[in-house]
Amino acid sequence: MTPALHLEILDLRHFSASYLKPVLEAESRVWDQRLRWDFHASASLLLQYLDSRLLPGYVAIENGRICGYVFCVYESEKALVGDVFAVPSVTNPQSAADVERRLLEHMIELLQHSPGVDRIESQLLLRPHGTHTETLRNAGFQIYERLFMELDLNSASLAGGPEGGSTDGLELRTWRDNDFSAAGHLIAQAYEGHLDGIINDQYRSVAGSLRFLHNIVRFPGCGLFDPSASRVLAYRGREEIAALLLCSRVREDVGHVTQICVSRKYRRRGLGAWLLADCSRALRLSGFQALTLTVTRENTDAVALYHRSGFVTRQTFDAMVWERRGGVRV
């Protein structure tokens, strides 16, 4: 911690939305500059929760001014650290990371000493990989490096289609509201034994996958869901799904892939590239400039697919997971 930095760390629930609004406005600018992401819808939703005074978390106060915050949400025996952010200082850029570290330490201490919490997850997109490694490792977290990747839709070739093997029984179409159940089953099956099921335990069951889908489609945390750009490879005449790509609008001219997965039966046939290309073509026709996605670096097959499709890494960040020893594991 910078010696001149004197902070108070106080309960977030003591403050109404108006006190946090300047910090969220500063954060919105960082999201746009760094990730081309319009954060205003997420900020508006967060402000509503702040006014309810029910959101667990902390604020950092320096010289009487709120300069950062952290919050979490609970899901059964799991806590999700939804965000941590401190306003960057022009004179001391490192101070923001120091403030965030203090906030994370308080949040983690609270959660690890909460008897009902057996698991903590978070993905800190705004902070480059390694920013808070020491704090997280000291607290017993596993850290997984993830990539935030971007495709320039103006220069991409957008070529892609099935390779080898018959796909005659499949129909490529846009997302429908009645796809929820089939999509939940596909996600749980596709991620069985997968690294990303360690990072996000919702992928480990159909019920968890349906909660994930509900959050993606109904809430603006990962942008505004765009069914016209989302793609489904469905079995003709059946309700099952062989592959899917879900896309949200994170800025008026930027789409974001919130989920892409392929049934084990149809892997290595070019279906992932096909979904990406078809989604990208639809976005470009609608005037979009870019498509983004996130992927775990250790997921080498997926990283290679995205590179072949023209994606480049815009930023790296950390996903973090902590589980209580002897706690309930799914």
Where are these regions (language model features)?
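C-terminal "cap" of GNAT-fold acetyltransferases
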Residues: 145-171, 289, 294-300, 309-310, ...
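Conserved acetyl-CoA-binding loop-helix of GNAT-fold acetyltransferases
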Residues: 93-109, 262, 268-285, 304-308
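A short beta-loop-alpha structural element at the N-terminal edge
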Residues: 3-24, 171-201
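Active-site rim helix/loop that mediates acceptor-substrate recognition in acyltransferases
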Residues: 33-57, 201-237
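Conserved donor-binding loop and adjoining core beta-sheet/short helix segment
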Residues: 35, 40-111, 245-254
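Conserved beta-strand-loop-alpha-helix junction that forms the acyl-donor binding cleft
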Residues: 120-131, 264, 293-303, 320-326
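Conserved active-site alpha-helix within GNAT-family acetyltransferase domains
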Residues: 126-145, 273, 297-315
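Acyl-donor-binding surface of acyltransferase catalytic domains
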Residues: 1-3, 77-78, 89-170, 176, ...
